[in-house]
Regions:
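Ferredoxin-reductase
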Residues: 2-93, 150-152, 176-179
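FNR/FR-type flavoprotein reductase catalytic core
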Residues: 81-191
């Protein structure tokens, strides 16, 4: 897939449209390309290089719906200087984008079969576009099962969305945590 700029080594300008806290150290940012240009198309499994001016850049998986061309969505855990800086960006702040890069998952090869997706912690973020694609083309597949594990209930990403998917019946969503409080009513154990 083509880069966001004519020269893939040069970041294209984008602005933070929305910032949402997922967990204590993880944020989801929605980015809009400068000059209201469409976001570059991407496929499930790809990533962008996000550039924080004056700090550096980091490879961050795309975590949004690949069918939406109006924005890019990235889920970032604040662990180093670049990811901490990107996570702290407020609405309207500038960020550079290069990409998308990487090989897409060949979901079309699973047509007619059951699909099981297994993720742990932040690993759900790069799999989320695949889940969006599977939902958009749901009739092409057998059962779709998501097995997702985190350290604790407070580490579950996209909680509202996972509940919506679970209640829709379109995806069999199973969540397990390593350590649970007495109030946790789900599975306990590792994925």
């Amino acid at each position: 897939m083509p880069s966001t700029a004519s020269d893939p080594s040069v970041p294209a300008a984008a602005r933070v449209l929305r910032r949402h806290r997922e967990t204590a150290d993880t944020w989801t940012l929605e980015l809009k390309m400068a000059n209201d240009s469409p976001a570059p198309p991407f496929a499930p499994g790809q990533f962008n290089m996000l550039y924080l001016f004056g700090v550096g850049e980091s490879a961050i998986s795309l975590s949004g719906d690949p069918a939406r061309s109006d924005r890019l969505v990235h889920t970032v855990r604040a662990v180093g200087p670049v990811s901490r800086g990107i996570s702290a960006l407020s609405r309207g702040a500038a960020v550079g984008v290069r990409g998308p890069f990487g090989t897409a998952w060949p979901l079309e090869h699973a047509a007619g079969a059951d699909v099981v997706i297994v993720a742990g912690g932040l690993g759900l973020a790069p799999l989320r576009p695949a889940l969006y694609r599977l939902l958009a083309t749901r009739r092409r597949y057998g059962r779709v099962v998501l097995l997702y594990g985190t350290r604790s209930p407070s580490d579950v990403l996209f909680q509202r969305e996972l509940e919506q998917w679970r209640h829709s019946g379109e995806i069999d969503v199973r969540i397990t945590v390593d350590h649970a409080l007495e109030t946790w009513r789900g599975h306990v154990g590792v994925v």
